[in-house]
Amino acid sequence: LCSMSCPMGINTGDLTHIIRQKELPQGSMGYKAGNFAANHFAGIKSALRPVLGLANLGHSVLGTKAMSCITKGMHNVLGIPLWTPAMPKAYSIKSSQLAIDNDTLRNKNADKDSAANGQLKVVYFPSCINQTMGLPKKSPVEQALASKMIALLQKGGYEVIFPENMEKLCCGTIWESKGMLDIADRKSAELEAALWKASEQGRYPVLCDQSPCLHRMRETIHKMKLYEPAEFIYTFLRNRLVFTPTDRPVAVHITCSMRKMGPVSYTHLRAHETSQDL
């Protein structure tokens, strides 16, 4: 929120990117590492899942207290990232199950007015984090965000489409944050081409479930209509699903990227419609 709060509109995030760009020029080891990651992104994500699985196995065997002590010592000695009980388990989207569910949905819609239901498709691009990381071991929620999003879309009658080669795609935020702006733009261009094809040249809406990712996508992709979850639900699913308000309190955290994009009102409207205690 730095630029929104500053009377001069100064964005310290952009300044940080410029400084990092100077510190990591092309040819530096850091830049080469970033370029390697961009070119082998699918492999890096695939390699991360076993690491998360191993950490979850260790947590299950050792328990929280012992796991915390051991990993804290490893962090102090080896400098590895600090483990916490909130670390997520590995996750991957089951494309085969999605295909079966889409076929079932397609057959169900065929019994109705095909002209009305033929357009009920959405291109869903889960963020890299939500493609790779699931829930913590002791999470009170049973379904990972991507699985829950797919189930909600299909419940609303929408066939879910993923862009081709989704494992290697990224909006570029990772590299933008490190000052590698040319690599970030290259990844954005790859994503735009894949989404353009998947949406049949903008015929179907595109949904992304992570607001910082969507913020960058909206800055670099202009040929398609891009939605975040609350906005998509309010626009397309509100009249196709029955929402029953709960008495449980709901906490709403609005990120700075959401405030910049403007769909905050949709989030508040959805929250008010689903909970009496906001």
Task: Give the location of each predicted region.
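Conserved AMP-binding A3 loop
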Residues: 278
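Cysteine-centered iron-sulfur cluster-binding motifs in ferredoxin-type domains/subunits
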Residues: 1-10, 257
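Iron-sulfur cluster-binding electron-transfer modules in prokaryotic oxidoreductases
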Residues: 12-270, 275
